[in-house]
Structures are given as C-alpha cells and as structure tokens.
C-alpha cells in the first residue's frame, strides 16, 4: 500500500543517542515507487532522567572515499563523491561475479562497466570515530525504471564491514524489504570520480 513507511533506529548506548531513519514510498504522485528518507537525531533518557545535550550529526568525513563491498554473491563499490552524493562503480572482479551469478543487475549482456557513473543522493551521519550511518537513495533509478530502494546501513571503517536494510520496490513493482551485511576493502575510484555523471548532479 502507499504511502508505506519503514522506521530504522541506530541506538548508541555508549553515548545514549539515537538516529532514526524514516523511509517512505508514495510521496511523489508522479513516481509512487520512489523512495524518500528523513533522518532524525535524538537521545535516550538516562537512568537519572537526564538527556545528553549532544546529538549525532551529518558529516563530510566520507567525501572522496570509496569502498568495494562484498555482499557474498556479488561485489559493488560505493564511491562517496561528496557529503551529499554517491556513485556506483564496478571493478573488473565485480563484473565477472555479477555476470556469473546475477547478470540481470547489468542488463544481461553487458560485460563492461558503464561509461557514465550512476549517481544519487546520500546522507552520512557520524556515530563515533570510524562508525557511520549512511542513507543511500535510488531516486534516479526510479525515474528511469519505475522502482528503487533506500539503503540504510551502519558502516564500521575500522573493521571494514557493514550491516543494514533495504526499503522500497523491486523490478516487478512489488514491495521489497531485506537486511544485508558486507565486508569491505578500500577502492581506488579516481577514474569513477572523473567520469561524467548520468544525471549531472553536482
């Protein structure tokens, strides 16, 4: 049904803080399956009844960094182009794995990376040093194909792994929600940074 709402919480029990992601579908009548996400920063009441004065906050720490994530059956690299936009990159190894295990991701017959970079909106939140909550939207995918997701995940850059969830619709237009985890490795994305974007987001 639309609008549909998904709520995900990141609980920081060390600092008694919380970041909530409110993801939804159906806000845009032109693209009813387009995901949207709002982040809200709050606090957890301490046993003595007090609330900490500080909150989690947006960060530019990830800007210019890129990570090749291994999700088990496929690899995909997230390139954090700026503090507000990300790009997707496919390493040669990732392309081989995708074509072998999940060729539909690349349009079936494609054997090489796109000449332009897919880019879209993101928000990054610093939980503490090396630990970030990241929200990625697939709004441009939705405009092109009629469906998309909001990915929200907690990323540990000291141990190079993440855990998160997807909220949105699949290629058949059905509601899609799943959880995921991945191991990451730093990726040299200089070429991806320099590529023209499909949608020219700057």
Language-model features: locations:
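Short, hydrophobic/aromatic-rich segments at coil-to-beta transitions
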Residues: 1, 61-67, 83-87, 128-134
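A eukaryote-biased signal for long
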Residues: 68-75, 80-81, 107, 148-202
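N-terminal glycine/threonine-rich, aromatic-flanked beta-hairpin/loop signature
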Residues: 1, 74-125
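A cross-kingdom feature marking solvent-exposed beta-strand/loop segments within repeated
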Residues: 1-6, 106, 114-121, 125, ...
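Short, exposed beta-strand/loop patches in secreted or surface proteins that constitute
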Residues: 9-11, 58-60, 76-81, 122-126, ...
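Beta-strand residues in well-ordered beta-sheet regions across diverse protein folds
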Residues: 21, 70, 89, 135, ...
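Hydrophobic, ordered structural segments
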Residues: 2-45, 142-181
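Surface-exposed beta-loop interaction hotspot
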Residues: 19-71, 186, 190-202
């Amino acid at each position: 049904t639309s609008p549909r709402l998904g709520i995900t919480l990141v609980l920081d029990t060390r600092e008694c803080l919380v970041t909530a992601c409110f993801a939804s579908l159906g806000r845009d009548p032109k693209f009813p399956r387009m995901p949207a996400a709002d982040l809200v920063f709050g606090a957890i009441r301490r046993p003595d009844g007090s609330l900490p004065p500080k909150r989690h906050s947006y960060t530019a720490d990830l800007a210019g960094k890129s990570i090749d994530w291994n999700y088990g059956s496929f690899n995909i690299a997230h390139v954090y182009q700026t503090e507000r936009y990300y790009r997707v990159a496919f390493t040669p190894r990732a392309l081989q794995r995708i074509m072998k295990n999940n060729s539909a991701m690349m349009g079936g017959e494609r054997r090489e990376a796109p000449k332009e970079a897919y880019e879209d909106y993101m928000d990054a939140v610093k939980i503490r040093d090396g630990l970030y909550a990241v929200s990625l939207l697939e709004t441009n995918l939705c405009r092109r194909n009629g469906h998309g997701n909001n990915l929200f995940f907690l990323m540990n850059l000291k141990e190079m792994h993440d855990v998160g969830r997807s909220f949105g619709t699949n290629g058949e237009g059905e509601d899609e929600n799943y959880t995921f985890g991945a191991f990451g490795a730093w990726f040299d994305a200089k070429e991806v940074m320099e590529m023209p974007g499909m949608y020219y987001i700057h």
